[in-house]
């Protein structure tokens, strides 16, 4: 048993979708979350920038004595997961493999769509992961760069959001039966995405799927937390504390969250 917290990292608020599912499925666990909102979105960034920024967040979480790191960010997972895993002696998990595996199980027509940031689509990690498991599946990938900005600005229910989602997803409508939400920001737009794609299309939340793998790793390494009466979940953001708080408290349905501003660039010294 291990009562140290689980660390989650993301380029902003998107990883809160993973945090919500983690708190629901694993209620005994404490979390420390870092969102690099100041440098979001990561999608247009170069591979070198994404690696450097991810190490900033990883080292920040290590300073909080976490027992596991969850890359609650598809872009970071695509670009840095294997690099970070090789360097650390604690478990590190990403969100791409769990999402891809679930989509393979759910599709009935062998036509899967993937929507993600530009960097994730460029990496082709979802396509490669699915191809390794099943050569019969056709994967249609689509970058939706505007979605992250909508979520980070807390405009998920606006008319602009409806129009952007509808226009962005038009190339996939009628062509797939399963759609991977390949960015942890995207579940915050789930209702609009479902409305656009049609109720017959199954939406796969890659972050939520990852929590099942987190549970397996906790058991395997015997680092589950004891049941406890008090929890101190800590959330950090590199910019926009008030906006982050508004989104986090609404999405997690938890009031009075412990949210602080964090400077993380100095945590990159050794990498």
From Swiss-Prot:
Please name the InterPro entries in this protein's record: Asp/Glu/hydantoin_racemase, Asp/Glu_race, Asp/Glu_racemase_AS_1, Asp/Glu_racemase_AS_2, Glu_race
* Keywords (A to Z) from UniProt: Cell shape, Cell wall biogenesis/degradation, Isomerase, Peptidoglycan synthesis
The family database entries (PROSITE patterns) matched by this protein are listed as: ASP_GLU_RACEMASE_1, ASP_GLU_RACEMASE_2
In Pfam terms, one family for this protein is Asp_Glu_race
Q: Which residues bind substrate?
A: 10-11, 42-43, 74-75, 184-185
Q: Which GO terms describe its biological process?
A: cell wall organization; peptidoglycan biosynthetic process; regulation of cell shape
Which enzyme class? isomerase
The keyword DNA-binding is assigned to this record:
no
Job description of the protein: Provides the (R)-glutamate required for cell wall biosynthesis.
Family the UniProt entry places it in: Belongs to the aspartate/glutamate racemases family.
The name under which this protein is listed is: Glutamate racemase
| Gene source species | Lactococcus lactis subsp. cremoris (strain SK11)
Encoding gene, per UniProt annotation: murI
